[in-house]
Amino acid sequence: MISQSTLFLFILLIIGLIAKNQSLTVAIGVLFLLKFTFLGDKVFPYLQTKGINLGVTVITIAVLVPIATGEIGFKQLGEAAKSYYAWIALASGVAVALLAKGGVQLLTTDPHITTALVFGTIIAVALFNGVAVGPLIGAGIAYAVMSIIQMFK
């Protein structure tokens, strides 16, 4: 008999293939590989607790590559500082990092929220070609909204 988790992943795989979403398809493929080689029992807990940090590290490395290659240097930084778009980007970066901080706090204190956030991310990735950074930022937005609601209670 097929387990509920296998069926769920299979449905998500079909959605990923139909939506032509490579990230979702590869992620599910890796999860199936781990699950069916029985490595999942050892690897899944690690991925569940450290996966977000691992992903953020990989994204950070990718973002810093142009600095490492010399493509972006102090000259480009100075030129960017003259652009109001750069200042908007800077403020956005600060806002997103602060939202993500609240998201980590929310996911730690209220883990059942994770289910709704994961579903929202899956919908965005599969149907709208979104990028799967949604749970952390989504949790941050949820945390901010919940904090505002608490202020008015």
UniProtKB/Swiss-Prot annotation:
InterPro entries: UPF0756_TM (IPR007382). It is a multi-pass membrane protein. The chain crosses the membrane at residues 8-28, 54-74, 87-107, 117-137. It is found in: Cell membrane. One of its GO terms (cellular component) is plasma membrane. Its main location: membrane. Keywords: Cell membrane, Membrane, Transmembrane, Transmembrane helix. Belongs to the UPF0756 family. This is UPF0756 membrane protein BC_4596. It comes from Bacillus cereus (strain ATCC 14579 / DSM 31 / CCUG 7414 / JCM 2152 / NBRC 15305 / NCIMB 9373 / NCTC 2599 / NRRL B-3711). The lineage of its organism: Bacteria, Bacillati, Bacillota, Bacilli, Bacillales.
